[in-house]
């Protein structure tokens, strides 16, 4: 789950991280009133969307008067902001964060993530802040600093000292950086975050460090422990189909292709998407119905897939372990009769009650294309949409 910048800063401040502060606007009629509350020489108007690259796309504006700030805020509110991380149509700006400007001496990059390849928490930092870290890693990898934290020992003083040293901080700034590392680590662990990113972390002209921008992504599996964080969820920023799927207990991610996929198990789902690409088409989605899906969940899964207007065909690939193939077959038929599947549908079943499932499908009277293995299924669905 993602949250907005202003929410991320609120959390970080609770853990002792110094951040820039501002005021939130969620209604156009509140813009002027909100800006009037700020007394500063420089105003920074920031679009609050769940995507990076806002600055380059015009979603962050720096102005030097209240009147300019009001005009910029009114112009920005409600637009569709297009960045390299949004869909082509962009993301609608329903919220603004208006801050006082800062005097910046130097910008740094600092983040903490769970490194799945190393199975541990890893700090990533760089003296090149305020830009895309992927670009820095590609062009000047030597400027990327990494420190991994052994899960058996947790954060140690040498991690904090090492990061401060590698970034070139000394004396009081090194002390400040050590405290920031400790605070960010505690926030990461205690909130079950997947990533905390501060970009840029700045040195002000007075020598103090400040988080000028912040992003936090949370592990959805840990949200049940944090109702206060779950309450920060902004459904307007999420794909409505993904929200609908989550409410139905389904794992769904829209991919932008033309073949809808319904699979049980994340590994099998990824293999299914790969083989669709291999045969010359593109998956429209990742959809894992889970191991204990019933008839109604299967029906809802197909409805969600068909809600995507880009879908030209559907591939159902089920291995019946915990799940029974006859239940899947009944769900497919119920969905087909209820909503009317007008695109080619290929079904590959294997495992528990597979013969019964195949019999149910063949006797349904519906135009369902059976497949005997994964390659056969991919070949048939790609051929069917051409």
Curated annotation (Swiss-Prot):
One of its GO terms (molecular function) is succinate-CoA ligase (GDP-forming) activity. Mg(2+) binds at residues 199, 213. One of its GO terms (cellular component) is succinate-CoA ligase complex. Binds 1 Mg(2+) ion per subunit. The keyword Metal-binding applies. Pathway: Carbohydrate metabolism; tricarboxylic acid cycle; succinate from succinyl-CoA (ligase route): step 1/1. SUPFAM superfamilies: Glutathione synthetase ATP-binding domain-like, Succinyl-CoA synthetase domains. The keyword Magnesium applies. ATP binds at residues 46, 53-55, 99, 102, 107. Residues 9-244 form the ATP-grasp domain. Its EC number is 6.2.1.5. Keywords: ATP-binding, Ligase, Magnesium, Metal-binding, Nucleotide-binding, Tricarboxylic acid cycle. Its cofactor is Mg(2+). One of its GO terms (biological process) is tricarboxylic acid cycle. It catalyses: succinate + ATP + CoA = succinyl-CoA + ADP + phosphate; GTP + succinate + CoA = succinyl-CoA + GDP + phosphate. Substrate binds at residues 264, 321-323. Heterotetramer of two alpha and two beta subunits. Succinyl-CoA synthetase functions in the citric acid cycle (TCA), coupling the hydrolysis of succinyl-CoA to the synthesis of either ATP or GTP and thus represents the only step of substrate-level phosphorylation in the TCA. The beta subunit provides nucleotide specificity of the enzyme and binds the substrate succinate, while the binding sites for coenzyme A and phosphate are found in the alpha subunit. Belongs to the succinate/malate CoA ligase beta subunit family. This is Succinate--CoA ligase [ADP-forming] subunit beta. It comes from Rickettsia akari (strain Hartford).
């Amino acid at each position: 789950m993602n949250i907005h910048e202003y929410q991320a800063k609120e959390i970080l401040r609770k853990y002792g991280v110094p951040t820039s502060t501002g005021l939130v606007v969620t209604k156009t009629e509140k813009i002027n009133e909100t800006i009037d509350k700020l007394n500063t020489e420089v105003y920074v108007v920031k679009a609050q969307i769940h995507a990076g690259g806002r600055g380059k796309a015009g979603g962050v504006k720096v102005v030097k008067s209240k009147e300019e700030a009001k005009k910029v805020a009114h112009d920005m509110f409600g637009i569709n902001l297009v960045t390299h991380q949004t869909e082509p149509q962009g993301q609608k700006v329903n919220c603004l964060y208006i801050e006082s400007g800062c005097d910046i001496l130097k910008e740094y990059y600092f983040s903490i993530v769970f490194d799945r390849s190393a199975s541990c928490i890893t700090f990533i930092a760089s003296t090149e802040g305020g830009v895309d870290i992927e670009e820095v890693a590609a062009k000047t990898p030597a400027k990327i600093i990494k420190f991994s934290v052994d899960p058996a020992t947790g954060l140690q003083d040498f991690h904090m000292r090492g990061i401060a040293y590698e970034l070139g901080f000394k004396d009081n700034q090194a002390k400040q950086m050590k405290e920031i590392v400790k605070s960010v680590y505690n926030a990461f662990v205690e909130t079950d975050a997947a990533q905390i990113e501060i970009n840029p972390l700045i040195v002000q002209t007075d020598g103090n460090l400040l988080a000028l921008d912040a992003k936090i992504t949370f592990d959805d599996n840990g949200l049940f422990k944090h109702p206060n964080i779950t309450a920060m969820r902004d459904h307007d920023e999420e794909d409505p189909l993904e929200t609908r799927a989550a409410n139905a207990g389904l794992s769904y991610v829209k991919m932008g292709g033309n073949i809808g996929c319904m699979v049980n198990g994340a590994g099998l789902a990824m293999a299914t998407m790969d083989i669709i690409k291999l045969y010359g088409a593109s998956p429209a989605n990742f959809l894992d119905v889970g191991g204990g899906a019933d008839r109604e969940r299967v029906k809802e899964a197909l409805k969600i897939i068909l809600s995507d207007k880009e879908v030209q065909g559907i591939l159902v690939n089920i291995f019946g372990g915990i799940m029974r193939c006859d239940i899947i077959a009944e769900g497919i038929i119920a969905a087909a009769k209820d909503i009317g599947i007008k695109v080619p549908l290929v079904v590959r079943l294997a495992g528990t009650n597979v013969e019964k499932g195949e019999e149910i499908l063949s006797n349904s009277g519906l135009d369902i294309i059976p497949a005997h293995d994964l390659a056969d299924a991919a070949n048939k669905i790609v051929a069917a949409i051409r």
